[in-house]
């Protein structure tokens, strides 16, 4: 139970001016709600899932160290895209690609699809990366 309680305090954003913190849980739930509000009815649930997954990589210990002012670069956006791919690729390949693009591109824009061993910034190449520690706790 302690691990779950600790995850509730993981930081998504910190206001540089006043130090106010937004947890990953708060941020993801707010983003999911906004994604649903801006969606057509048929895609509300898919967009909710995209909102929930988009920053799941911020649960990495390395990202939390960054939020505590450690000067390190941490890839977080690709983690949610990899999860969407794993869950949706077999039953809904086209849907999986759309979700991956939305999640992976939420900071840097939507990358080219690319081919295996293609450009380093292509979606295909990014999805094959090993990401940080992916551990929590």
Question: Residue locations for each model-derived region?
Answer:
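Accessory nucleic-acid engagement/destabilization modules that flank
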Residues: 2-18, 24-137
């Amino acid at each position: 139970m302690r691990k779950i309680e600790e995850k509730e305090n993981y930081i998504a954003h910190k206001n540089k001016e006043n130090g106010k913190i937004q947890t990953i849980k708060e941020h993801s739930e707010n983003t999911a709600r906004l994604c649903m509000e801006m969606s057509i009815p048929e895609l509300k649930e898919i967009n909710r899932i995209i909102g929930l997954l988009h920053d799941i990589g911020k649960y990495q210990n390395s990202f939390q160290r960054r939020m505590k002012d450690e000067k390190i670069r941490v890839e977080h956006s690709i983690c949610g895209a990899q999860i969407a791919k794993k869950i949706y690729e077999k039953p809904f390949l086209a849907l999986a690609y759309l979700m991956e693009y939305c999640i992976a591109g939420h900071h840097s824009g939507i990358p080219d699809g690319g081919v295996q061993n293609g450009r380093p910034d292509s979606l295909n190449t990014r999805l094959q990366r090993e990401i940080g520690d992916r551990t929590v706790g």
